């Protein structure tokens, strides 16, 4: 068959785009950014791609073009974000957007059909390029995802995406994709109309060839949904609803979302050309916002973190994982190990009930994915075969690492170390999922202390992205590197932190929670305190968080922190009454809020359990300015984060920012505690703490690190390059 004949190259170029003309007069443009693992778009590529298209136009008998990646698993992962850091004005950033718009418009205007054959990540500018093509076909491979994630960087699609996508898949669907930045898998993209076909990878090119035979795409009649939304009245209602819903989620903290709605609406109502102008202008302005700078900072920090092992050693391979404890944490750790890490897991519990709980929990998690059509039943069955359990140590002789997830009891954890050293192989690493107990204490008496380490997951394990890796003084570098490698295999972001009370995340969280407690004891209603912090940018308020984590679990950490770090960690004495009243939070339906088991709180809103007020001898009445509530809690967190850096609990400011955002939901648009302090300026940070100290006591006294930085007019990150780790 002619389509299968070898290609004959007509150009050889160092460009990221190379043209090959097949014997059947179909051109194939291979995308391969030199020296990079994935394809990303750079500003200099505009001329390269237009040059390749011009070469194609010179071929008189050309039937059409296919765009396909020459890299194994990446179509185009988006634009090179470092370009934006070089922009010194909104106008410069706007010009970048205009360049992309003009380039893709020329592709759309070509006299012959163009097909995007997509395998791997097709995101951001990569999808905008694909949208400019006549047809799109993607592979059914799990590595293939499509989306416009710019909003997650505080931006909007700047190369025509806000204008092309609504016309392709409909206004409401396009707004949802652009405002959430979520990724679609192949079948989802097909159902939405984002791609024309989704096929096995091995016939991707053949399918693209068949598509080209249809010729240039003609305008298609509007579907009933699009016809309905073409009515100005209906459209007005839709935009109003979307704006209200978005505002309720963002509380005005993410300017990109409002710009997206404005730009999409402008294009729909005033035409594509006006839409392009507004898109480029809005893109330029958003690039210069502090919110986008903060989100881009997190993006670069996350990427930099992935390149470090946390230790000066190579990781040893992990083939088999043991888990002690079949509870919620143990079951969650088993889930991410099997489903993301693709590793066999052996769970040990003291009784069959614990094993069955873990297996049932994993079955339920996988069934949810099957029901959402993100997994086939056969894949669910395969993954379940990776998880087994018993009430003894059979199978643990094969374990390369054993993760302990038992009760927070030092004697019990030491017993677990001893039993693993008796029953597992000499090379087996023992990782404790403790949230508060110092690792060096757990390792006391161990025969192989160099293989004992902390591995602190956050609940729920399948959703929370962070883990803290905690070596003690005698943990080997190989153990650290291996544990970090396992965490990444589980899909986690891992930060290496010091072996001190509370580690990092819980240490900065505790004073924040305590300050909320002081506000409550001053008579401020629970819902007012929580809402103030949610408006500030946290995903949930401190009392809702306590209910979710478990009041009993959270309070176990406080004595450890108080004993080692001082009275600023001591909870108000009145809070003892909460535990004595049997309040554990959501898990027993009794906490700061009421929980109706037939409803979900996010559907109906939480209702405060007002019986807690007389328990604390408090008469609740809103009287504290919400800005002051959030300031008090956040400043306690910032001060403690600076102490952690000063004491070496975290290795650098980058790790502190990642840990706070991914571990407790510190507002991403602020970039993390250290980025936020740099933005405020040390003078403002210290001055605010001193004012609060005068009003509320010495718990607000600024730490030595902050005082010294103010004196020396220093910042945590170099002013010219926020993407480097800081001192």
Curated annotation (Swiss-Prot):
<dbReference type="InterPro" id="IPR006180">
    <property type="entry name" value="3-OHacyl-CoA_DH_CS"/>
</dbReference>
<keyword id="KW-0413">Isomerase</keyword>
<comment type="pathway">
    <text>Lipid metabolism; fatty acid beta-oxidation.</text>
</comment>
<protein>
    <recommendedName>
        <fullName>Fatty acid oxidation complex subunit alpha</fullName>
        <ecNumber>4.2.1.17</ecNumber>
        <ecNumber>5.1.2.3</ecNumber>
        <ecNumber>1.1.1.35</ecNumber>
    </recommendedName>
</protein>
<dbReference type="InterPro" id="IPR012802">
    <property type="entry name" value="FadJ"/>
</dbReference>
<comment type="similarity">
    <text>In the central section; belongs to the 3-hydroxyacyl-CoA dehydrogenase family.</text>
</comment>
<dbReference type="GO" id="GO:0006635">
    <property type="term" value="P:fatty acid beta-oxidation"/>
</dbReference>
<dbReference type="GO" id="GO:0005737">
    <property type="term" value="C:cytoplasm"/>
</dbReference>
<keyword id="KW-0511">Multifunctional enzyme</keyword>
<keyword id="KW-0520">NAD</keyword>
<feature type="site" description="Important for catalytic activity">
    <location>
        <position position="150"/>
    </location>
</feature>
<dbReference type="GO" id="GO:0070403">
    <property type="term" value="F:NAD+ binding"/>
</dbReference>
<keyword id="KW-0443">Lipid metabolism</keyword>
<keyword id="KW-0560">Oxidoreductase</keyword>
<dbReference type="InterPro" id="IPR050136">
    <property type="entry name" value="FA_oxidation_alpha_subunit"/>
</dbReference>
<dbReference type="GO" id="GO:0016509">
    <property type="term" value="F:long-chain-3-hydroxyacyl-CoA dehydrogenase activity"/>
</dbReference>
<dbReference type="GO" id="GO:0004300">
    <property type="term" value="F:enoyl-CoA hydratase activity"/>
</dbReference>
<dbReference type="InterPro" id="IPR008927">
    <property type="entry name" value="6-PGluconate_DH-like_C_sf"/>
</dbReference>
<keyword id="KW-0442">Lipid degradation</keyword>
<dbReference type="Pfam" id="PF00378">
    <property type="entry name" value="ECH_1"/>
</dbReference>
<dbReference type="Pfam" id="PF02737">
    <property type="entry name" value="3HCDH_N"/>
</dbReference>
<dbReference type="InterPro" id="IPR006176">
    <property type="entry name" value="3-OHacyl-CoA_DH_NAD-bd"/>
</dbReference>
<dbReference type="Pfam" id="PF00725">
    <property type="entry name" value="3HCDH"/>
</dbReference>
<keyword id="KW-0456">Lyase</keyword>
<dbReference type="InterPro" id="IPR006108">
    <property type="entry name" value="3HC_DH_C"/>
</dbReference>
<comment type="similarity">
    <text>In the N-terminal section; belongs to the enoyl-CoA hydratase/isomerase family.</text>
</comment>
<comment type="subunit">
    <text>Heterotetramer of two alpha chains (FadJ) and two beta chains (FadI).</text>
</comment>
<feature type="site" description="Important for catalytic activity">
    <location>
        <position position="128"/>
    </location>
</feature>
<dbReference type="GO" id="GO:0008692">
    <property type="term" value="F:3-hydroxybutyryl-CoA epimerase activity"/>
</dbReference>
<dbReference type="InterPro" id="IPR036291">
    <property type="entry name" value="NAD(P)-bd_dom_sf"/>
</dbReference>
<feature type="region of interest" description="3-hydroxyacyl-CoA dehydrogenase">
    <location>
        <begin position="316"/>
        <end position="727"/>
    </location>
</feature>
<keyword id="KW-0276">Fatty acid metabolism</keyword>
<dbReference type="InterPro" id="IPR018376">
    <property type="entry name" value="Enoyl-CoA_hyd/isom_CS"/>
</dbReference>
<dbReference type="InterPro" id="IPR001753">
    <property type="entry name" value="Enoyl-CoA_hydra/iso"/>
</dbReference>
<comment type="function">
    <text>Catalyzes the formation of a hydroxyacyl-CoA by addition of water on enoyl-CoA. Also exhibits 3-hydroxyacyl-CoA epimerase and 3-hydroxyacyl-CoA dehydrogenase activities.</text>
</comment>
<dbReference type="InterPro" id="IPR029045">
    <property type="entry name" value="ClpP/crotonase-like_dom_sf"/>
</dbReference>
<keyword id="KW-0963">Cytoplasm</keyword>
<feature type="region of interest" description="Enoyl-CoA hydratase">
    <location>
        <begin position="1"/>
        <end position="200"/>
    </location>
</feature>
């Amino acid at each position: 068959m002619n389509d299968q004949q070898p290609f004959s190259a007509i150009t050889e170029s160092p460009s990221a785009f190379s043209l090959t003309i097949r014997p059947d007069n179909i051109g194939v443009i291979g995308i391969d950014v030199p020296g990079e693992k994935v394809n990303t778009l750079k500003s200099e590529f505009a001329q390269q791609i237009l040059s390749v298209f011009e070469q194609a136009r010179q071929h008189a008998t050309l039937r059409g073009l296919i765009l396909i990646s020459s890299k194994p698993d990446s179509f185009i992962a988006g634009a090179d974000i470092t370009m934006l850091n070089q922009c010194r004005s909104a106008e410069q950033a706007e010009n970048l957007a205009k360049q992309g718009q003009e380039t893709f418009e020329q592709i759309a205007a070509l006299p012959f059909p163009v097909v995007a054959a997509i395998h791997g990540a097709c995101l951001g500018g990569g999808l905008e390029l694909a949208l400019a093509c006549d047809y799109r076909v993607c592979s059914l491979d799990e590595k293939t995802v499509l989306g416009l994630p710019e909003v997650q960087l505080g931006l909007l699609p700047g190369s025509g995406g806000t204008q092309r996508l609504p016309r392709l898949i409909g206004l409401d669907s396009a707004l949802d994709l652009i405002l959430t930045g979520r990724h679609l898998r192949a079948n989802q993209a097909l159902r939405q109309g984002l791609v024309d076909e989704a096929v096995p990878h091995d016939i991707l090119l053949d399918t693209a060839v068949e598509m080209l035979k249809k010729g240039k795409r003609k305008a298609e009649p509007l579907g009933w949904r699009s016809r309905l939304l073409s009515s100005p009245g209906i459209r007005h209602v839709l935009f109003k609803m979307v704006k209200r819903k978005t505002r309720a989620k963002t509380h005005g903290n993410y300017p990109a979302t409002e710009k997206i709605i404005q730009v999409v609406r402008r294009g729909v109502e005033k035409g594509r050309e006006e839409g392009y102008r507004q898109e480029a202008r809005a893109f330029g302005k958003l690039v210069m916002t502090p919110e986008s700078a903060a989100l881009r900072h997190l993006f670069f920090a996350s990427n930099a973190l992935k390149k470090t092992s946390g230790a000066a050693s190579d990781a040893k391979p992990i083939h088999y994982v043991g888990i002690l404890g079949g509870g919620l944490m143990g079951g969650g750790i088993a889930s991410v190990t099997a489903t993301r890490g693709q590793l066999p897991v052996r769970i040990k519990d003291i009784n069959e009930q614990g094993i069955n709980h873990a297996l049932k929990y994993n079955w339920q998690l996988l069934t949810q994915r099957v029901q959402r059509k993100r997994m086939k039943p056969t894949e669910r069955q395969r993954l379940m075969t990776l998880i087994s359990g018993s009430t003894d140590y059979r199978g643990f002789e094969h374990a390369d690492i054993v993760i302990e997830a038992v009760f927070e009891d030092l004697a019990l954890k030491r017993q677990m170390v001893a039993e693993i050293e008796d029953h597992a192989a000499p090379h087996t690493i023992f990782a404790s999922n403790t949230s508060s107990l110092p690792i060096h204490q757990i390792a006391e008496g161990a025969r192989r202390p160099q293989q004992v380490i902390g591995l602190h997951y956050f609940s729920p394990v399948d959703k929370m992205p962070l883990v803290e890796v905690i070596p003690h003084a005698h943990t080997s570098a190989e153990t650290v590197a291996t544990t970090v490698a396992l965490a990444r295999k589980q899909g986690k972001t891992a930060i290496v932190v010091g072996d001190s009370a509370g580690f990092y995340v819980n240490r900065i969280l505790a004073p924040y929670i305590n300050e909320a407690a002081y506000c409550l004891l001053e008579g401020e209603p629970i819902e007012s305190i929580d809402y103030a912090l949610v408006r500030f940018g946290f995903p949930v308020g401190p009392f809702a968080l306590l209910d979710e984590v478990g009041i009993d679990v959270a309070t176990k950490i406080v004595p450890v922190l108080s004993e080692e770090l001082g009275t600023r960690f001591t909870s108000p004495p009145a809070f003892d009454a909460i535990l004595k009243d049997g309040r554990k939070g959501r898990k027993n339906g009794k906490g700061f809020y009421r929980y109706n088991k037939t409803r979900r709180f996010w559907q109906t809103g939480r209702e405060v359990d007002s019986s807690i007020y007389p328990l604390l001898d408090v008469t609740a009445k809103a009287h504290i300015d919400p800005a002051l509530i959030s300031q008090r809690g956040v400043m306690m967190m910032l001060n403690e984060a600076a102490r952690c850096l000063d004491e070496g609990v975290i290795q650098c400011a980058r790790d502190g920012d990642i840990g706070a955002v991914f571990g407790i939901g510190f507002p991403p648009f602020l970039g993390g505690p250290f980025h936020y302090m740099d933005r405020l300026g040390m003078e403002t940070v210290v001055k605010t703490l001193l004012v609060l100290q005068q009003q509320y006591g010495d718990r607000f006294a600024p730490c030595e690190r902050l005082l010294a930085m103010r004196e020396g007019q220093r910042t945590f990150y170099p002013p010219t390059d926020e993407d480097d780790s800081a001192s």
